[in-house]
């Protein structure tokens, strides 16, 4: 995957991909962390793959710099998450890489976001208020 991206994957995200999950989809894309997609076939065997991490390194917002490693998106407005060299995770809008919110680590981001996003859905997984943004900053 690093060869395809022509860059190294940030260490904390390598740890996530190799020890926890090859990408992650929380509440059907409310928050998606990208990973290694080995096939683009759409049959049942290949349908559960993550979004391709390499794509995020190409389709970046303005103001982004080479030291920002993009790892995920929110489907509400296609805003981004990225990791900086200090391994902090940042939230930004899709058009501008200026950090609007920061977590100290991928683990901190996951714990707080899963808890927060969980409160936006009922017991059946349906959005309580479909018009309410699902991003960390409104």
Residue ranges and their predicted role:
Residues 99-124:
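Compact, glycine/acidic-enriched structural inserts
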